[in-house]
Amino acid sequence: HLTTPAVRMLLMTSSESVIDVLRSAYLEELETVMNYRTNSIVLEGVRAQEIKESLEADIAEELGHAGELGQRLKQLDANPPGSAAFTAQQESLQPPADSTDVLAVIDGVLDAEDGAISTYQQLVELARAADDPVTEDLAVEILADEEAHRSEFRGLRKEYSGD
């Protein structure tokens, strides 16, 4: 189809924004994996087991998301970032000083999921604006996973805060 130079420029700018957010999301997923792994190791106590198991299960899914995002970047003729591009962001997901503080970890997970949901909502909009239905579909798929994780941990939050 025919596009004007202004429309082509807008689509190019939109495509660059899509790539920027894909790269950011890729790094966020890997940071989440690091923090989930650390918390699944550090947490202890009778109450911690369910949370540790949930974090362990989510690690594989988050790694899968990173893989999908990296592949999409490659398809767009861009590369996923290396570790030199990484700046830690997830302060609330750092291991708690008290290794039995299950609620601190749950709250950190909820913060991380809220951040991921925001990122994927932004990616959906940018991909739509860039006329990139493949990235839009990927973002919607991952968004659904992140919303499911948030729902799971909201339930755990209710359960553990009621003790």
List the model feature ranges, each with a label.
Residues H1-D163:
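Iron-associated oxidoreductase/ferritin-like identity signal
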